[in-house]
Amino acid sequence: MTESPTSPSGTAPTAGAFLDDAALGRLRPLSFAVAYRMLGSVAEAEDVVQEALTRVSQSPDVRNPDAFVTTVTTRIAIDVLRSARVRREQYVGEWLPEPLVGPGSSLPVAMAAPSPDVARHAELADDLSTAFLVLLETLTPTERAAFLLHDVLGFPHSEAADVIGTSEVAARQLASRARRRIARHVAPQQVATQDEAPQHAAPRPPGQDDPAPDALTSRPRTASDRARAEELVSRFLAACEEGAVDSFLELLAEDVVLAGDGGGKVPLGMSIARPVAGRVTVARMLASFVGRGAPLHFERALVGGEPGLLIVADDVVGGGLIGTWSFEVSDGLLAGIRGVINPEKLGHLGQLADLDRLQAALRSALEARTAARRTAARQTADQEPTEN
């Protein structure tokens, strides 16, 4: 389907002027925001943005630049995602989205708000969470596009259909199917999809959908929710500094899940191969990680628009970013902890740590602790009375 340089439901253009560099520059944040939500990859999103803006720059008389760049970006991203899904199926370990850190990250466009002409029902910074992007990975490319266009960006189904290249009925079905897929991964009582609404609910006008439930994004939605999330992260940071299992236990939900993404690119022992579940197991693993004497520290940051932590190497091993931790909060406790330490997913955030140097420091710390324990054991044995 050929893109029209208008809004998805606009009229045919006439020959005339092209958008200048300044106008294209203003479109870049919106294009990136759409591409990143479609792909969960900064590098892939940047490639899509470059291609989309090139196509837009070659189209005369673009009457609705925001809608047009959204259309072009989405169509390119659908094709990219189809091939990316094959690669992700062969990924080593758990695949997690590339984190965005801000404000003040090296990608300030990630926090930019779009024109209200397109994103009239959403803030682009309001659906960046790792938990939300992980849920989107359960969708097919066209389901993901239909859901984002309608439920996040506020496109009518008719315009979303034009973007995707299908009928309005099919676009509506894609978005509905996306909600049902996502609903399987959140508490059933939190979600009532269009096809599964309670019988006592008031009837909807014909053709009207339920908005996407807040539960689908797993984000703090009120000031008190945000304050609770910030408090939990502060207490988690204190637990990391203390290193005691009990300090973590009081913060974790019973069914908490800890997931790590090293992509097979980090030294053995610095990442987990598959997610770990359960309050006690996760607490012990966290205490073990922070208690190894590694030359690293944690810094508060917004990760995916939510309170999170950066894992940073100390200057003694050259400094640099090791990874990020993002958190999912449910009922006032941490229900999900996701760490990304694959260096190929962190390069956009600045200087990275030298993992080989960090691993060597970890080995030295382990050897020192082992030697200290042996020395203490010998001293204890020497002090014990001997039998005559």
Q: Which role fits each region the language model picked out?
A:
Residues M1-A238, A244:
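Active-site-adjacent scaffolding segments
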Residues E231, G243, A277-T281:
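Generic recognition of short, well-ordered alpha-helical interface segments
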Residues R235-E242, D246-S247, L251, M285-S288:
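Amphipathic alpha-helical regulatory segments at dimerization interfaces
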Residues F248, V256, G332:
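Hydrophobic pocket/interface hotspot
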Residues E254-E299:
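A solvent-exposed, acidic/Ser-Thr-rich amphipathic alpha-helical stretch
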Residues V280-A368, T386-N388:
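Low-complexity, glycine/alanine/valine/leucine- and proline-rich hydrophobic stretches
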Residues R374-N388:
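Long, low-complexity, intrinsically disordered segments
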